């Protein structure tokens, strides 16, 4: 059995998305600063059902004019494990709140991890 423990939740406001980190994980933010790029992993909790996890082919971007593709070849939220990934810039950190660019996650979306972006590790050489 696998166990995921959210480290915080997403909060949307007019200008930014705010990552609200739970108090027990705030110490893990040490070393992050304004201007850093981070990778944020979230759990698409509103798309999480047994039926939706079985969907393995989708029309990209939900457009039926696009031919069906396997979910691993798309950015669809319908997946066997509904994990979302965003690479974003930190605009501000205040206590347990990280202010980032807007992302398409709902309020209260569980944050499952944050990683510092590393060009060496995260950008393949083509």
Swiss-Prot record:
Pfam families with a match to the protein in the record: TrmO_N
User: What positions does the entry give for S-adenosyl-L-methionine binding?
Assistant: 45-46, 75, 106-109
Q: Tell me if rRNA processing is a UniProt keyword of this record.
A: no
| Entry keyword set | S-adenosyl-L-methionine
For this protein, the record's InterPro entries field holds: TrmO-like_N (IPR023370), UPF0066_cons_site (IPR023368), YaeB-like (IPR040372), YaeB-like_sf (IPR036413), YaeB_N_sf (IPR036414)
Listed SUPFAM superfamilies: YaeB-like
Q: Where is the signal peptide?
A: none
In this protein, which residues make up the domain named TsaA-like? 4-126
**Belongs to which family?**
Belongs to the tRNA methyltransferase O family.
Q: Which PANTHER family does this UniProt record tie to the protein?
A: TRNA (ADENINE(37)-N6)-METHYLTRANSFERASE (PTHR12818:SF0)
Q: Which NCBIfam families does this chain map to?
A: tRNA_TsaA (TIGR00104)
Give the protein name, as stated in the record. Answer: Probable S-adenosyl-L-methionine-binding protein MJ1583
């Amino acid at each position: 059995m696998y166990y995921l423990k959210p480290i915080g939740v997403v909060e949307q406001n007019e200008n930014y998305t705010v990552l609200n980190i739970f108090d027990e994980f705030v110490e893990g933010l040490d070393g992050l600063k304004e201007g850093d790029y981070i990778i944020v992993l979230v759990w698409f909790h509103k798309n999480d059902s047994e039926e939706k996890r079985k969907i393995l082919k989708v029309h990209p971007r939900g457009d039926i004019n696009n031919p069906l593709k396997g979910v691993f070849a798309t950015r669809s939220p319908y997946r066997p494990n509904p994990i979302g990934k965003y690479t974003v810039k930190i605009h501000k950190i205040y206590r347990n709140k990280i202010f980032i660019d807007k992302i398409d996650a709902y309020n209260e979306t569980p944050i499952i991890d944050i990683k510092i972006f590393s060009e060496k590790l995260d950008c393949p050489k083509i």
